[in-house]
């Protein structure tokens, strides 16, 4: 599969009294056309800031891309002006945000919000855009699409609002869909329906997905490949099968063993000790060392590089130093 998105050495910093705070620090990954890649990690790991950097929205939150490149096919998005971004945002790259209630405009009807995108990006006439909006709502599972067009967001349930967000995000047949915790506020049944819907629609349009989540159950259902982030860095990158069968990084292992199991007796839930360091108070060596059960002396003073493991996946850990090649 050919590469759609390539992120190289991405560094996104925030500033406190002119002091740089690294929220994303040297992130590398790629997404192929038609591939679903999950970006996972605890809160504060840099997942959402990575997605906002790709969308060109991090500046509005006070952040700044300090280094690296974000290439969408042959376009380097880091060189884009806001006007350039406006042409691709919602068109070639779309995003579903965590909470649909705060993402939808409360004073506009659902129909107005979908047709606005089509009129702006596809130069459709109002009547044509309205017809397409009805088709999109039917496509995401609304049987009363004409009625939903007239409703305001507060009149819809959480699952219905999320379906509307998916309809808006896919309205222009984007090449890349970024879904930031798309099932967080939904119950388990609606979660499954939304994931299945995203999967079906993206297969239909050959859309690539960057799925941002901390829910490994969602990852196992929806992703082809998984990128694990910790403290603004990628610590492991593997296919979903490899990651669940044999996690390499101690942090990935900790995430997987903390998932509760249904069968067998459970004395107590496993948990990773400690908490994620804040970006303004990072350890001098490996960022996971203070919480790692396998930490060695050099982990406390030296930062490990991202290595290509003999299995073909990448991992940032001194445990695999002898059997891996450092990424250039």
From Swiss-Prot:
Membrane topology qualifier: Peripheral membrane protein
Protein location: Cell membrane
Keyword Cytoplasm part of the UniProt annotation: no
Residues engaged in binding ATP: 41-48
Keywords for this protein: ATP-binding, Cell membrane, Competence, Membrane, Nucleotide-binding, Peptide transport, Protein transport, Sporulation, Transport
Ranges of residues in domain ABC transporter: 5-256
Annotated InterPro entries: AAA+_ATPase (IPR003593), ABC_Ni/Peptide_Import (IPR050388), ABC_transporter-like_ATP-bd (IPR003439), ABC_transporter-like_CS (IPR017871), Oligopep_ABC_C (IPR013563), P-loop_NTPase (IPR027417)
Listed Gene3D superfamilies: P-loop containing nucleotide triphosphate hydrolases (3.40.50.300)
GO molecular function: ATP binding; ATP hydrolysis activity
CDD domains xrefs: ABC_NikE_OppD_transporters
GO CC terms, sorted: plasma membrane
Record keyword Acetylation present: no
A Gene Ontology biological process term: protein transport
Cited Pfam families: ABC_tran, oligo_HPY
Described function: This protein is a component of an oligopeptide permease, a binding protein-dependent transport system. This APP system can completely substitute for the OPP system in both sporulation and genetic competence, though, unlike OPP, is incapable of transporting tripeptides. Probably responsible for energy coupling to the transport system.
NCBIfam families named among the record's database cross-references: oligo_HPY
Family membership noted in the UniProt record: Belongs to the ABC transporter superfamily.
Protein name: Oligopeptide transport ATP-binding protein AppD
């Amino acid at each position: 599969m050919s590469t759609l998105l390539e992120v190289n050495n991405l560094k996104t910093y925030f500033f406190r009294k002119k002091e740089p705070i690294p929220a994303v620090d040297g992130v590398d990954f790629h997404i192929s056309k038609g591939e679903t890649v999950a970006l996972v990690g605890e809160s504060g790991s840099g997942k959402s800031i990575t997605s906002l950097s790709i969308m060109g929205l991090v500046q509005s939150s006070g952040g700044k891309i300090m280094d690296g490149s974000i290439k969408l096919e042959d376009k380097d998005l880091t060189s884009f002006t806001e006007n350039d971004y406006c042409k691709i945002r919602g068109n070639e790259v779309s995003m579903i945000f965590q909470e649909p209630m705060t993402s939808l405009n409360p004073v506009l009807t659902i129909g107005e919000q979908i047709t606005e995108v089509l009129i702006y990006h596809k130069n459709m006439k109002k009547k044509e855009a309205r017809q397409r909006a009805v088709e999109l709502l039917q496509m995401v599972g609304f049987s009363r699409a004409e009625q939903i067009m007239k409703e305001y967001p507060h009149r819809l349930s959480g699952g219905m609002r999320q379906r509307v967000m998916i309809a808006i995000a896919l309205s222009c047949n984007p090449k890349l869909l970024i879904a930031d915790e798309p099932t967080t506020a939904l119950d388990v049944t609606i979660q499954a329906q939304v994931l299945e819907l995203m999967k079906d629609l993206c297969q239909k349009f050959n859309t690539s997905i960057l799925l941002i989540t901390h829910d490994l159950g969602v990852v196992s259902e929806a992703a082809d490949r998984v990128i694990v982030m910790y403290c603004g860095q990628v610590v492991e990158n593997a296919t979903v099968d490899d990651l669940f069968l044999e996690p390499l990084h101690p942090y990935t292992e900790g995430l997987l063993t903390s998932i509760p199991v249904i069968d067998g007796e459970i004395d107590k839930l496993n948990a990773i000790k400690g908490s994620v360091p804040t970006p303004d108070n990072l350890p001098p060596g490996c960022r996971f060392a203070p919480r790692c059960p396998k930490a060695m002396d050099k982990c406390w003073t030296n930062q490990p590089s991202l290595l290509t493991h003999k299995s073909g996946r990448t991992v940032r850990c001194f445990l695999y130093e002898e059997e891996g090649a450092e990424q250039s």
